[in-house]
C-alpha cells in the first residue's frame, strides 16, 4: 500500500474504488478531508491549531457503502477508527452509555494499533529470547547462574495480604529444586547452539516441557468498588495496583511450540515501553482519529411529533464532543478538536434539518449516496478486490468443486436483487448476500461429494431464485 502522504485526493479515490463501487461524491469528500490532514501538518504550529477538520454527513439508504467508505479510509490512512451507533447513547443522567465513551473507544483502538506496531518491531528480539528460555528448560545445566532480585514493595504487599491477591487456588511454595551441575562453558555453548538450531527447525515442536508462566495478580472482588473501569476518571486504579502486586507463577505442561509463543508474548511485554505507546496512541487518536457515527437520523426529532427530550438530549451531549473537548480516558486525556467525525443516516423518516441547528453546523460537508442499480450489482459481484463471487468460488474450490459462473448468470442475479429491493425493502448491496446464499445453498450442501465442476448460468439462477423472487410473500421471508 502506498504511503498515504504521497496520495493525492484523486489517488485516494482510486484506492477506494478498489473495494467500493460507485458513490463518487462521497469518496471525493472523504479524500479531500484526508488530504487536508496532511496539508495541515505542513503548516506552522500556530495555524495548525486553528484549522479543524470539516466533519462529513453521509445521507443514503442502508447497504450503499457509507460505513465501508469510512472504514476503508481509516485503513488507508493508518488512522485509529471506531464505528458507533447513535441509538446506543442516552442523555446524561439516564441509564445507558454516555457519549464520551466513543472517545474512550477511540483511545482503545489507538492503543491496540500502536501496540501492534511495537510488537512487530520487537518480534525478532522477543522470539530470540523465547528460544533462549526454552533452551534453559531443555538443558538447565547450560543456564548461567542468576541472582534472584525481588521487588521489595511487592514482597511487602504480598506478605500483608497473603493469598488475597492473584490466584486464590495458588499452591504453597514448594521447596527449591536441587541445583543442577553446571556444564563447562565451552560445552554449554555447544549444547545451546545445537538446541537453538533444532528449535528453529521445528524438531522439538511437539515435545512436552514444563514451564513457569506468570499470572497477573488480581485484586479481591469488591476492593475497588463497582462500576465500569472504562468510565473511571483519572485512569484504571485497579490496573495500577495489580501491577504492584507480586507476580504468581504457575507451572504448565505445554509443547515447545506453545512455550515459544508464551515466552515470546512475555518478552514482548518486557520490551515494549507502554508509556511511550500511550503517548503515541493519544497523539495519533487526537490528530488522526476518525469516529463514524451511524444511524444519526434515529436521534433526530421527527417533524410534526414535537420535541423528544431523550433524542434531543443525546444530540446536545454529542455536540461538545464534535465541537472539540477534552475527555479523560484510562490512558490520559484525549482532545477531540482535530478528530474527524463522519455521521451517516438513511433519513427515511426524518431530514437532516430535523437535527438541532448547532449539530447541523458541525457537519458542514453533506454528501448524498445513490441507491444501487442492477449495473452496480453486477460490478459489485465481480470487480472489487475479493468480490462476492470470488469468495464463493474460493470456498467451494477448497472442497475441490470448480465453479464456472457465466455472464448471463451474473446479470440474472443482479436483476433479481434489484427487483426484490425495489418491491420490498431497499437494503442495498446486502441483498446480494441473501440472494447468493440461496443460490449456492444446494451446491454448498452437496460438496465435496458432488460433481467436481458446476456451471451456473441464467436458467440455473432462475430455477433457484425465480419463483421465490416473483412471489412477494416468499421473498419477504427468504430473500
Indicate where each model-derived feature is located:
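Non-catalytic accessory segments flanking P-loop/AAA+ NTPase cores
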Residues: 1-479
Amino acid at each position: 500500500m502506498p504511503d498515504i502522504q504521497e496520495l493525492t485526493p484523486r489517488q485516494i479515490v482510486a484506492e477506494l474504488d478498489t473495494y467500493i463501487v460507485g458513490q463518487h461524491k462521497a469518496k471525493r469528500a472523504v479524500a479531500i478531508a484526508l488530504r487536508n490532514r496532511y496539508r495541515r501538518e505542513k503548516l506552522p504550529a500556530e495555524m495548525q491549531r486553528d484549522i479543524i477538520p470539516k466533519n462529513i454527513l453521509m445521507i443514503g439508504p442502508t447497504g450503499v457503502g457509507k460505513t465501508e467508505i469510512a472504514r476503508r479510509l481509516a485503513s488507508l490512512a493508518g488512522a485509529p477508527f471506531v464505528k458507533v451507533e447513535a441509538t446506543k447513547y442516552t442523555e446524561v443522567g439516564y441509564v445507558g452509555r454516555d457519549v464520551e465513551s466513543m472517545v474512550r473507544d477511540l483511545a482503545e483502538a489507538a492503543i491496540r494499533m500502536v501496540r501492534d506496531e511495537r510488537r512487530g518491531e520487537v518480534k525478532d528480539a522477543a522470539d530470540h529470547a523465547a528460544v533462549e528460555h526454552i533452551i534453559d528448560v531443555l538443558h538447565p545445566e547450560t543456564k548461567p547462574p542468576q541472582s534472584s532480585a525481588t521487588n521489595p514493595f511487592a514482597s511487602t504487599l504480598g506478605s500483608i495480604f497473603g493469598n488475597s491477591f492473584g490466584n486464590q487456588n495458588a499452591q504453597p511454595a514448594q521447596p527449591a529444586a536441587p541445583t543442577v551441575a553446571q556444564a563447562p562453558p565451552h560445552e554449554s555453548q555447544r549444547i545451546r547452539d545445537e538446541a537453538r538450531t533444532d528449535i528453529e527447525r521445528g524438531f522439538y515442536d511437539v515435545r512436552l516441557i514444563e514451564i513457569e508462566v506468570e499470572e497477573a495478580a488480581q485484586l479481591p472482588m469488591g476492593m475497588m468498588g463497582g462500576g465500569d473501569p472504562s468510565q473511571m476518571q483519572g485512569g484504571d486504579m485497579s490496573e495500577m495496583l495489580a501491577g504492584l502486586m507480586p507476580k504468581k507463577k504457575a507451572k504448565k505442561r505445554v509443547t515447545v511450540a506453545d512455550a515459544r509463543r508464551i515466552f515470546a508474548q512475555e518478552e514482548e511485554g518486557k520490551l515494549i515501553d507502554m508509556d511511550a505507546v500511550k503517548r503515541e496512541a493519544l497523539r495519533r487518536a487526537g490528530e488522526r482519529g476518525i469516529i463514524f457515527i451511524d444511524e444519526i437520523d434515529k436521534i433526530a426529532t421527527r417533524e410534526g411529533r414535537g420535541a423528544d427530550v431523550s433524542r434531543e438530549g443525546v444530540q446536545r451531549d454529542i455536540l461538545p464532543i464534535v465541537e472539540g473537548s477534552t475527555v479523560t480516558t484510562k490512558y490520559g486525556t484525549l482532545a477531540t478538536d482535530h478528530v474527524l467525525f463522519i455521521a451517516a443516516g438513511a433519513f427515511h423518516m426524518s431530514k437532516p434539518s430535523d437535527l438541532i441547528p448547532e449539530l447541523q453546523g458541525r457537519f458542514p460537508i453533506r454528501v448524498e449516496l445513490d441507491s444501487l442499480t442492477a449495473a452496480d450489482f453486477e460490478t459489485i459481484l465481480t470487480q472489487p478486490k475479493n468480490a462476492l463471487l470470488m469468495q464463493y468460488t474460493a470456498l467451494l474450490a477448497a472442497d475441490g468443486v470448480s465453479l464456472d459462473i457465466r455472464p448471463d448468470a451474473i446479470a440474472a442475479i443482479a436483476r433479481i436483487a434489484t427487483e426484490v429491493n425495489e418491491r420490498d425493502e431497499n437494503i442495498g448491496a446486502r441483498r446480494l448476500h441473501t440472494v447468493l446464499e440461496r443460490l449456492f445453498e444446494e451446491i454448498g450442501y452437496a460438496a465435496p461429494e458432488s460433481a467436481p465442476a458446476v456451471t451456473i448460468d441464467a436458467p440455473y439462477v432462475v430455477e433457484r431464485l425465480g419463483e421465490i423472487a416473483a412471489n412477494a410473500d416468499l421473498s419477504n421471508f427468504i430473500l
